[in-house]
């Protein structure tokens, strides 16, 4: 019982960076972009609660006071200047309060870094992904590239998430501005990591750009968010954020393996 209690308490404070069964809320924010999305959701939800309370009160009050038992002869009110002004202005002001922070967040998300520290190209295939780190070239002037396949359902290791783990993760340094270039090799794909607040579609014939800056170390899981064929559900995305030193060591090892 004590171990079970400690386990539940640990799960309560542990960060959520992958989808969970019956999950209703968002995953924990790993980037300023995702934190902005969560904050905007909370702000809009506040206005929704106000509208719900106001409309419910008006509805209950109308049903309570204006019925056949309490008021057999209905009142005939055909005009009310004050209430008409209020019910016209009030619904117009609420969307304004919602639109201003929404557009501010939208334009900040749409902005692409002019001079990012690292550029990573994600190429969608049926049904795996290829990644290119064009900032690091090996001796034969080829970019650091590798393929990322999902680990089969019957071959996971202890601690790996079922149908969410891959053989080669996307390793990035934490607290570093990154630029993602997303494009497909065949059909429509998408590169989406909920904890990062990123969903960038891979449209045939186009290269879409998005920016990302992971603020804490960890492993973040995502999946393809556009129907891309039979194995659409089996193309996960795994991003591992590490320290800058560990990232440099990983790049060095990958370049050595690629040249051999």
From Swiss-Prot:
Binding-site positions, Cu cation A1: 189, 224, 228
Residues where Cu cation A2 binds: 224, 226, 228, 232
InterPro entries registered for this protein in UniProt: CcO_II, CcO_II-like_C, CcO_II_C, Cupredoxin, Cyt_c_oxidase_su2, Cyt_c_oxidase_su2_TM_dom, Cyt_c_oxidase_su2_TM_sf
Catalytic activity: 4 Fe(II)-[cytochrome c] + O2 + 8 H(+)(in) = 4 Fe(III)-[cytochrome c] + 2 H2O + 4 H(+)(out)
One GO location term (cellular component): mitochondrion
Transmembrane segments: 36-56, 89-109
GO aspect biological process, one term: ATP synthesis coupled electron transport
Subcellular location: Mitochondrion inner membrane
Catalytic EC class: translocase
Topology, Mitochondrial matrix side: 57-88
Segments in the Mitochondrial intermembrane topological domain: 1-35, 110-260
Co-factor(s): Cu cation
Positions of Mg(2+) binding: 226
EC number of this enzyme: 7.1.1.9
Keywords: Copper, Electron transport, Magnesium, Membrane, Metal-binding, Mitochondrion, Mitochondrion inner membrane, Respiratory chain, Translocase, Transmembrane, Transmembrane helix, Transport
Database matches in SUPFAM superfamilies: Cupredoxins, Cytochrome c oxidase subunit II-like, transmembrane region
One function term, GO molecular function aspect: copper ion binding
Its job: Component of the cytochrome c oxidase, the last enzyme in the mitochondrial electron transport chain which drives oxidative phosphorylation. The respiratory chain contains 3 multisubunit complexes succinate dehydrogenase (complex II, CII), ubiquinol-cytochrome c oxidoreductase (cytochrome b-c1 complex, complex III, CIII) and cytochrome c oxidase (complex IV, CIV), that cooperate to transfer electrons derived from NADH and succinate to molecular oxygen, creating an electrochemical gradient over the inner membrane that drives transmembrane transport and the ATP synthase.
Record text on subunit structure and interactions: Component of the cytochrome c oxidase (complex IV, CIV), a multisubunit enzyme composed of a catalytic core of 3 subunits and several supernumerary subunits. The complex exists as a monomer or a dimer and forms supercomplexes (SCs) in the inner mitochondrial membrane with ubiquinol-cytochrome c oxidoreductase (cytochrome b-c1 complex, complex III, CIII).
Family: Belongs to the cytochrome c oxidase subunit 2 family.
Name of the protein: Cytochrome c oxidase subunit 2
Taxon lineage: Eukaryota, Viridiplantae, Streptophyta, Embryophyta, Tracheophyta
């Amino acid at each position: 019982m004590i171990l079970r209690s400690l386990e539940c308490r640990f799960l309560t404070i542990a960060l959520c960076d992958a989808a969970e069964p019956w999950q209703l809320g968002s995953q924990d924010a790993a980037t300023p972009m995702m934190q902005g999305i969560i904050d905007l959701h909370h702000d809009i939800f506040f206005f929704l609660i106000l509208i719900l309370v106001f409309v419910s009160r008006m509805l209950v009050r109308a049903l309570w006071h204006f019925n056949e038992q309490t008021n057999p002869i209905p009142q005939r009110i055909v005009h009310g200047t004050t209430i008409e002004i209020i019910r016209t202005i009030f619904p117009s002001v609420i969307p304004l309060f919602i639109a201003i922070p929404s557009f501010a967040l939208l334009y900040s998300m749409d902005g692409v870094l002019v001079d990012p520290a690292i550029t990573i190209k994600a190429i969608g295939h049926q049904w795996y992904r290829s990644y290119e780190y064009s900032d690091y070239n090996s001796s034969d002037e080829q970019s650091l590239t590798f393929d990322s396949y999902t680990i089969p359902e019957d071959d996971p290791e202890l601690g790996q998430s079922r149908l969410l783990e891959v053989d080669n993760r996307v390793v990035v340094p934490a607290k570093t501005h990154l630029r993602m270039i997303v494009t497909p090799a065949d059909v429509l794909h998408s590169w989406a990591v909920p904890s990062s607040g990123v969903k960038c579609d891979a449209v045939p014939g186009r290269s879409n750009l998005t920016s990302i800056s992971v603020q804490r170390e960890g492993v973040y899981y995502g999946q393809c968010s556009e129907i891309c064929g039979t194995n659409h559900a089996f193309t996960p995305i795994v991003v591992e954020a590490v320290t800058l030193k560990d990232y440099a060591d990983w790049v060095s090892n990958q370049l050595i393996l690629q040249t051999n």
